[in-house]
A protein has these predicted regions:
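Bacterial c-di-GMP phosphodiesterase EAL domain
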Residues: 1-91, 105, 118-119, 134, ...
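EAL-family c-di-GMP phosphodiesterase catalytic domain
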Residues: 6, 10, 19-25, 70-77, ...
């Protein structure tokens, strides 16, 4: 799922979305993640996704891929070594990878998580705090976790052109992140009106159906996305 630069000056940024195919039907995470969480398989699933992305991705420094990871994955003391080993077996540059941590998940060992993030960032990996603003953990995580991006929760973004409250929240979150040197990404952008407001607010990246719908990673084509963005700009 692509995140496009609102001011058209940043590199292309894509988020990997996980789907499970069963009898020709694509199942959304809401169908298979709860059982994985219940039986303790989420970390294993995260590692499988990382391995697959690292295997398929080639060096292109103008491309940044976001991979969602769970709090239990980040808590795991062996995660850092796993990433390094997987990296050595791939053609990936660390600068191409951004690990996304949802605010909605619990990071039990915050000190260990911070240490892991710092070590991986030193190598060039980047980190994003997802669903920013969705709960009470927002500002605590922003203070404690050394991230490069925050993704503003789509519930605030979706109708910001029709809601003064949403507009105020998005503007405040954007200013807070910017003041800390963190790049903002707006989720759930579904109309030109919302996109226009985000550009005025100076939000760096936008993600949503207005810009592009998710597609299989096998047909990732940067020129196609650039053409579509041009159509949105002129249409």
């Amino acid at each position: 799922d692509p995140m496009l630069s609102a001011n058209k000056t940043h590199m292309e940024f894509y988020e990997v979305l996980l789907r499970l195919e069963e009898n020709g039907e694509l199942l959304l995470p809401a169908r298979f993640l709860p059982p994985a969480e219940r039986f303790g398989f989420v970390s294993t699933l995260d590692r499988w996704v990382i391995s697959e992305v690292f295997r398929d991705l080639h060096r292109d420094r103008n491309l940044l891929i976001g991979i969602n990871i769970d709090g239990t994955t980040l808590d795991d003391p062996t995660f850092h070594d796993f990433v390094l080993q997987t990296l050595q077996q791939s053609q990936v540059s660390p600068m191409q990878i951004c690990f996304e941590i949802s605010e909605k998940v619990t990071v039990n060992r915050i000190t260990r998580a911070v240490d892991t993030i710092k070590k991986l960032r030193t190598l060039g990996f980047r980190f994003a705090l997802d669903d920013f603003g969705s709960g009470v953990a927002s500002f605590g995580y922003l203070e404690e976790l050394p991230v490069d991006f925050v993704k503003i929760d789509g519930r605030f973004v979706q109708g910001l052109h029709q809601s003064d409250s949403n507009l105020i929240v998005v503007e405040a979150l954007s200013k807070l992140a910017t003041a800390k040197g963190i790049t903002c990404i707006a989720e759930w952008v579904e109309s030109k009106e919302v996109m226009d407001h985000l550009e005025k607010l100076g939000v760096a990246y936008a993600q949503g159906f207005y810009l592009h719908r998710p597609e299989r990673i096998s047909i990732l084509d940067q020129s196609k996305l650039e053409n579509q963005r041009a159509e949105k700009t002129t249409g």
